[in-house]
Swiss-Prot record:
It comes from the Viruses. Residues 228-246 have a biased composition (Acidic residues). This is Putative BTB/POZ domain and WD-repeat protein R731. The lineage of its organism: Viruses, Varidnaviria, Bamfordvirae, Nucleocytoviricota, Megaviricetes. The keyword Cell cycle does not apply. It comes from Acanthamoeba polyphaga mimivirus. The keyword Repeat applies.
Length: 518
């Protein structure tokens, strides 16, 4: 007769607690204490590569006493007990990190990249840096430093190589996606959709410097959302809120859309500004104001600090596009492009053109527009003249400047993207056939950095591409049937502020090193 022994974890726990048939006394010593355990060699052998090697190849295989110098005796004790089925508790971040160090010593899988590290109190942050310094600045540790940097912490005391490592794991931007059913936010940090706001009537959306948004919607927002009260527009202002009689135009509401983030949990809150508009909206970082088309001939200026209308500009033709660029604004009407001085309200120049596509770059002081579908015109706001023409053979659907003004790109109806150098008189550098990457072609694209393009097709498949290396960085599939894409835009991500802070310190340290060497 053959008997099968069933040793579950409760049997092993009893075996340990009662010290039945123990054949080894394990001494665990760190800088503070020594803990002695009565254990079973066969359990250690089967549970841990370190002990397996020890009891196979070294003198300890015949010894009844084993002495180990360890990083943390208490945690090593807990890990050895876990071989018997005892739960391994992780009460704080220090315990979690020390557990990784001990497991690494014992040749166990640490699973460090999967640890949901507990929050690190501000008073413990320097201690955390000291601990990380011992185990090495791997990607996991760098990300945890970013996630736990206290407010107003002096990052300048970090060495340049550490700052560059931190910058490499910062996620400065999220991706805002407008679809038929509403708006979505894709997090590159968490590699998933983190917010879905269902409102199929959202027309336009603009981000402000504080990370919030203003958007226009033709539906009544859910009563659970916050309504305007103290912030409501003054009734004495001429808001042009009377319903328009113009055929094809209807007034819609302007809302403020705020996002609160707790790790990968994003929540939206909505505030009704009390304003009615009919057309596009545009945000001016220079003035911290939102420009809104209140009827087809008028642009009103909404100050986001005092939350009231402060100015109005009147035009003779239907307004199609507005783009504030520092102290000027490009206004595209149904028959021409007007350059407006925002300081005195005077028209600086007019261009006869019927276009619905423009892109501007405030650093270069220029904007680009499409003329007759196939011609790109580069217009200087300094000379008030066209400085460059790019002629193309097919219809151009999108144009865009890179953040640091290095590149100008456009995409034609065949989903081929053309890359031009702004530093070399708009010379063509390369072309990219995005039909190879996106089955349904390019619906919209956006620069995430000065050299990284994010392109999306109408269904929601995303391709992230490096202009300089010509390599695909990532493919993302957030496609949905019967929920087509309208457009995408980058928005401030969870690491936006810290990214800017680190970038500034790196620049200062680099300049300092250069000045010393020279």
């Amino acid at each position: 007769m053959i008997y099968h022994i069933n040793m579950d974890k409760h049997s092993l726990i009893d075996l340990y607690n009662n010290e039945v048939l123990t054949d080894c006394q394990l001494h665990l010593t760190d800088s503070i204490e020594t803990i002695v355990m009565n254990v079973h060699k066969n359990i250690l052998y089967m549970s841990c590569p370190y002990f397996k090697s020890m009891f196979t190849n070294f003198r300890e295989q015949k010894s009844s006493t084993v002495k180990l110098d360890v990083h943390n005796a208490r945690i090593t004790y807990d890990i050895v007990k876990s071989f018997y089925g005892f739960p391994l508790e992780e009460p704080n971040w220090k315990y979690q990190i020390d557990t990784h160090i001990v497991k690494d010593f014992l040749l166990l899988e640490t699973g460090l990249e999967n640890i949901n590290l507990l929050p690190i109190p501000a008073e413990d942050f320097d201690n955390f840096i000291d601990v990380v310094d011992k185990i090495g600045y791997n990607e996991f540790c760098l990300k945890k430093i970013i996630d736990n940097i206290p407010d107003n912490y002096d990052l300048s005391k970090f060495p340049l190589d550490l700052l560059n490592g931190l910058l490499a794991v910062c996620f400065k931007y999220d991706l805002h996606i407008s679809r038929e059913t509403g708006v979505y936010i894709w997090s590159f940090k968490y590699n998933k959709l983190v917010l879905s706001y269902f409102d199929s009537s959202i027309i336009d959306i603009e981000q402000t410097f504080d990370g919030g948004f203003y958007f226009s919607s033709s539906t009544i927002i859910d009563s659970n959302h916050e309504e305007s009260s103290d912030d409501e527009v003054n009734d004495d202002e001429d808001t042009d809120n009377e319903d328009t009689d113009d055929e094809g135009y209807c007034q819609i509401s302007l809302f403020k859309f705020n996002i609160s983030r707790t790790n990968d949990k994003y929540e939206a809150s909505i505030l009704n500004t009390g304003l009615k508009i009919i057309g596009p909206i545009a945000y001016s970082k220079h003035f911290n104001q939102v420009f809104i088309v209140t009827d087809k001939y008028n642009i009103c200026v909404y100050d986001t600090d005092i939350k009231n209308l402060v100015n109005k500009f009147v035009f003779n033709d239907t307004i199609e596009i507005i783009a504030p660029i520092k102290d000027k604004m490009v206004v595209v009407t149904s028959i021409q492009i007007i350059i407006l001085n925002l300081l005195d309200g005077k028209n600086l120049s007019k261009i006869d053109s019927n276009t619905n596509i423009i892109s501007y770059n405030s650093n270069l002081g220029v904007f680009a527009y499409i003329n007759n579908n196939t011609n790109v015109c580069i217009y200087s706001l300094e000379s008030l003249s066209i400085t460059t023409n790019i002629n193309h053979s097919t219809t151009i659907n999108h144009i865009l400047y890179s953040p640091k003004s290095k590149y100008f790109i456009f995409c034609d109806e065949n989903s081929i993207i053309y890359v031009y150098s702004t530093k070399d008189n708009y010379s063509l550098i390369k072309t990219i056939d995005f039909k190879k990457f996106l089955k349904f072609g390019v619906k919209d694209f956006e620069f995430m950095t000065s050299k990284i393009i994010v392109a999306i097709d109408i269904k929601g498949k995303i391709c992230i591409w490096n202009i300089e290396t010509e390599q695909i960085i990532q493919n993302i599939d957030c496609s949905e049937d019967y929920n087509n894409i309208y457009n995408i835009q980058k928005i401030n991500g969870p690491d936006y502020s810290i990214h800017k802070k680190i970038s500034k310190i790196i620049q200062e340290k680099t300049q300092s090193k250069l000045s010393i060497s020279s």
